[in-house]
């Protein structure tokens, strides 16, 4: 084999093996990275835990692991009302979807989320969350209800069977769900939740949520 061809062959083999080594190392790193969960408080009575597709109501604070600086606080948004979101459908970062699975209403957790389950190499919010940042969240879960996106639930809310959800119908549904939760909430809280639902889902602004609008999951920033 001519020297030039021999060198080229060795060159190709080297980079092929290097590529395999790099890919295996990346897979190993992905396997070793995981969301770490510390349960700070768990109620003694827990008849229902959160699962994919459930509608959750929670507050959470976010910190950068490297220096402990706070970058997010849900209590500073929506007049301090807890956030509503559906678990496991990408409305929050993947790490939070994992961290909030199998939680009881009233449970508190502290979780550590590696970059691969957060914002990765890109970072977020114009440098507020830098690239490759490990994040810490302190979470308090208030309520777990059946996810609102199933056909069955749509039919339950749609009392007059006109295939659209009015504010009155959704308001009644929320009232029933809050009563099941057995935690006192004033009318202003329920009104705020109702307003938020229509703000995120009534895309054509007609005052109703259609089946199409109902089945569109919104992606929140955090």
UniProtKB/Swiss-Prot annotation:
Q: Which residues bind Ca(2+) 1?
A: 158, 160, 162, 164, 169
**Which residues does the UniProt record annotate as the domain EF-hand?**
145-180, 189-222
Where does this protein reside within or beyond the cell? Endoplasmic reticulum lumen
Which intervals hold domain PPIase FKBP-type?
53-145
E.C. designation(s) = 5.2.1.8
Principal subcellular localisation of the protein = endoplasmic reticulum
The signal peptide here is 1-23
Q: Which GO terms describe its cellular component?
A: endoplasmic reticulum lumen
Please give the catalytic activity noted in the UniProt record: [protein]-peptidylproline (omega=180) = [protein]-peptidylproline (omega=0)
Key word Transmembrane present? no
Q: Where is this motif: Prevents secretion from ER?
A: 219-222
Note one Pfam family from the annotation. EF-hand_5
The residues that hold Ca(2+) 2 are 202, 204, 206, 213
Glycosylated position list: 45
Q: Which UniProt keywords apply?
A: Calcium, Endoplasmic reticulum, Glycoprotein, Isomerase, Metal-binding, Repeat, Rotamase, Signal
Q: Is Endoplasmic reticulum included in the keywords of this UniProt record?
A: yes
- The domain of life for this entry's organism is Eukaryota
**A GO molecular-function annotation:** peptidyl-prolyl cis-trans isomerase activity
Summarize the PTM comment.
Answer: Glycosylated.
Role played: PPIases accelerate the folding of proteins during protein synthesis.
Q: What else is known?
A: Binds calcium.
Under PANTHER family, the record lists: PEPTIDYL-PROLYL CIS-TRANS ISOMERASE FKBP7, PEPTIDYL-PROLYL CIS-TRANS ISOMERASE FKBP7/14
Q: Quote the protein name from its UniProt record.
A: Peptidyl-prolyl cis-trans isomerase FKBP7
Organism for this UniProt entry: Pongo abelii
Q: Which gene encodes it?
A: FKBP7
